[in-house]
Amino acid sequence: MIIIVQHKVRDYDAWKAVFDEHQAVRKQHGATGHELYRGLQDPNEITAVNHFPSKEQAEAFAADPSLKEAMERGGVISEPRITWAQETEAVGYKA
């Protein structure tokens, strides 16, 4: 189960520091990892992919009040776009 969150931030470095501080909360809810992506045209456009073992754990994390506070403190300036997804295939290609 993954949660894909896209939003714009005021300043990537300031946002990233808060994102890193919030890792303990993600782990507390069972998160097993994440990936971060920055927009090519706008490096303050962030896509965060968070991995959870179950939908219930992902939902509990999304409902945690500290998440909204962290997003505000990190300088999120747009309404987040959230996609919930279940992995169906992951394939790596060798050069």
Where in the sequence are the language-model features?
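Short, well-ordered beta-strand segments in beta-rich or mixed alpha/beta enzyme
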Residues: 2-8, 35-64, 85
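Short amphipathic alpha-helical segments
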Residues: 11-33, 66-71
